[in-house]
Amino acid sequence: GFFLNALKNFAKTAGKRLKSLLNHASCKLSGQC
């Protein structure tokens, strides 16, 4: 119940953060920031 939902939310948030970090890193590498 609660614990599983918290875990899902955490995974979702972590995924979003990781994605934006990767996007930022790749735009820095390609010099398009």
Swiss-Prot record:
Q: Which GO terms describe its cellular component?
A: extracellular region
Q: Where does the record locate the signal sequence feature?
A: none
Query: Where's it found, cell-wise?
Result: Secreted
Q: In which tissues is it expressed?
A: Expressed by the skin glands.
Q: Does the keyword Transmembrane helix apply?
A: no
User: What keywords are annotated for this sequence in UniProt?
Assistant: Amphibian defense peptide, Antibiotic, Antimicrobial, Disulfide bond, Secreted
InterPro entries per UniProt: Antimicrobial_frog_2 (IPR012521)
Record-level GO BP terms:
defense response to bacterium
- What's the superkingdom here? Eukaryota
Cysteines paired by S-S bonds: 27-33
What does the record give as the function of this protein?
Antimicrobial peptide active against E.coli (MIC=5 uM), K.pneumoniae (MIC=10 uM), B.cereus (MIC=7 uM) and S.aureus (MIC=12 uM). Has very little hemolytic activity.
Q: Which family does it belong to?
A: Belongs to the frog skin active peptide (FSAP) family. Brevinin subfamily.
Name of the protein:
Cyanophlyctin-beta
